[in-house]
Amino acid sequence: MKVVAIQPDVPIAEVERSLVHLEDLIGQAAREHSPDAIFLPESMTTKNVYDRRMREVARPIDGAPLQMLRRAARAHDCVVGGGFIAIRGNDARGTYAVVEPDGTALFHDKDQPSFWENNYYSAGTDDGVIDTSLGTIGIANGFEWGRTRTARRMLGRVRLLAGGMHFPSFPTWKATKPWFWDRDHFALVQYARETPPRMARLLGVPAVHPSHVGDFVMETMLVPGLAWPSLCVGESAICDADGVVLQRLGFDDGEGWVCADVDIDAEPRPRDPMPPGFWNSLLPISVHAVWHVGNVHGRVKYEGMKLLRRHRWQQ
């Protein structure tokens, strides 16, 4: 099966502009490769950052992002997947849609928002296993790629792992450069690069890992007025079931796409043992610190705004 992973560089919270651009990228990749499936990252409509403009990005589940995916799937006669913040009943979710050429759409809601994402949407409850015309696919959004519980709920049940990533790095502040940038940024890039093959080996199936790329400036949690200049690291990849990287795009490659043939007919055969912990690999202490602070801060703010009906999607 021929699959494409698209690595986009989209602006913050310019949903309609980004959708036009993404549809063009899908078209270019489809015309070049005639693939069976094309996958975009999670939160394809915006960089998934901490910024007041993010209050504007949630769209109805059947709104413009899904309609773009449907147009693309029909136009290019292939499965197309991409993520966006969707209004799902009384909540917003980090949703990933996989759309068939006939317009049928299947969804996965991210099981746990990461860091500041908790400000903008809440946790989903489905297992991320979907049955498509191509076979049974597992969908992982963002840091779901890094958690053992993602692999455990898909183990032996899927023939391909797809979905996508948004992997921002540390701020480039001069005062913290020796620690955050010169040391931990490098560790994060390595982690992002190793994540798709690691999950492929844990599940024993091929993996398609599209990811955001490009510079951005966001706000800083709990420090009003302090800008957080940084970047999304890229590291989009397509791997086989042994974790061999067939195609890859790093930060220096910028926006683009890669294509590879993967075998989804073979029975899943895990190559690596399942780690016992929450994460499937080690992360810097600084990431854990931002993780815990961001999770608590975001959940409290999300639920408080929901109670007061202050979210834009509640208006």
Regions found by a protein language model. Give the residues of each.
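Short hydrophobic segments within beta-strands
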Residues: 6, 99, 140, 208-210, ...
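Short polar catalytic/cofactor-binding loops
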Residues: 7-13
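Active-site catalytic loop in hydrolytic enzyme cores
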Residues: 61, 87-194, 252, 273-276
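CN hydrolase (nitrilase-like) catalytic-core segments centered on the catalytic cysteine
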Residues: 61-81, 145-256
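C-terminal beta-strand edge segments of enzyme domains
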Residues: 129, 206-315
